[in-house]
Each structure stands twice: as structure tokens, then as C-alpha cells.
């Protein structure tokens, strides 16, 4: 069974086409129009071992908000679709990842319930040209549309670039663990309810 999905989403603000392969090798082809977001999404895919293609056009003449949030929405929808009924997955994932002085922790439960807890203070309002408040918007959109429980916590860090990158890599490693097939589970759904 292939665990792939392609989502097209067009609104008056953005037009996004995204393809994901959960059993990839971390290959990416990403163009959102926001350089730093592309960099973070590349890191996410590489460390989660997802193949990820994203094409986004949007109202960047206004700001980066709509693009960042909508890419999160579509990525969450694609992840949910690619997972299907979630038979045989590990379901839970966690990681603590350093990036120089920054240390970020992420925990994921592919529970079918949307909850995002974000505890990541930034000392600067921008990294490059991107507003740092948009990282929370991205992960809330991603986690909410994937119907996952996602906790992201900054344990240490002062450099804005390092903090953001540690968060994306921690989520990537946690996601890699959660979507991985568990040979001990077989084709069972990892829930006492029998459904996720």
C-alpha cells in the first residue's frame, strides 16, 4: 500500500499544490515564495524522511501570513490522507533536537484529535524577512488539519534561526517515528478503540 497524497487548494489568497510520500527518502522540491519557509520545510522533509513537493503562489505583496498558514493546512490534509486508516503505524513520536545553543522538544500523537500546544518564545520578531509569529500559525494549521496532538517546546535557545530550525527538526524526527510502520503491530490500528 502506498502512503502518498496530492492536495490542490485554491482560495482568493493562495494557490497550493502539495504532494507527499510518507515512505520517501527526504527528497524535496519546494517553492512557496518565502525563502526561509522553504528552508524549514526542506529540513522537515529531510529529517522526517518524507518526499515533499510544494508549489505555492499567493498574495505575498500583502505579507507571508496566508502562504505560511495555508501551506500548513495543505500539509496537514495531505498527511492525514496519506496515513489512511493508520493501520500498523507507531502512532506516537517524540524527539529532542539541538541546533547549537537551541534545544527543542516535540511530541506527536496521531490520535485523530486536533490539539497543538506551542511553547516557543522568540527573542526577535523576524528571522530574515519572515515574522517569527508565523511559525506558530504554521504548526497550528498543520497539526489541526492532520488531526494530531502536537506539542512543541523550546528548552533553550537565543538565536532566532537556530530556534526555528530546532523546532522544525524536532517535529520532523517525532513525525518520522509516529508514521513509521511497527512490525509488532502488523495491520492492527494502534488504539484500544479500534479506530483513529
UniProtKB/Swiss-Prot annotation:
Domain of life: Bacteria
InterPro entries: IGPD_sf (IPR038494), ImidazoleglycerolP_deHydtase (IPR000807), ImidazoleglycerP_deHydtase_CS (IPR020565), Ribosomal_Su5_D2-typ_SF (IPR020568)
UniProt pathway: Amino-acid biosynthesis; L-histidine biosynthesis; L-histidine from 5-phospho-alpha-D-ribose 1-diphosphate: step 6/9
Location within or outside the cell: Cytoplasm
Signal peptide as annotated in the record: none
UniProt keyword list: Amino-acid biosynthesis, Cytoplasm, Histidine biosynthesis, Lyase
Gene3D superfamilies: Imidazole glycerol phosphate dehydratase, domain 1 (3.30.230.40)
One Gene Ontology CC term in the entry: cytoplasm
Main location group: cytoplasm
GO molecular function per UniProt: imidazoleglycerol-phosphate dehydratase activity
GO BP terms: L-histidine biosynthetic process
E.C. numbers: 4.2.1.19
Reactions mediated catalytically: D-erythro-1-(imidazol-4-yl)glycerol 3-phosphate = 3-(imidazol-4-yl)-2-oxopropyl phosphate + H2O
Pfam family, one: IGPD
Family statement drawn from the similarity comment of this UniProt entry: Belongs to the imidazoleglycerol-phosphate dehydratase family.
Protein name (Swiss-Prot/TrEMBL): Imidazoleglycerol-phosphate dehydratase
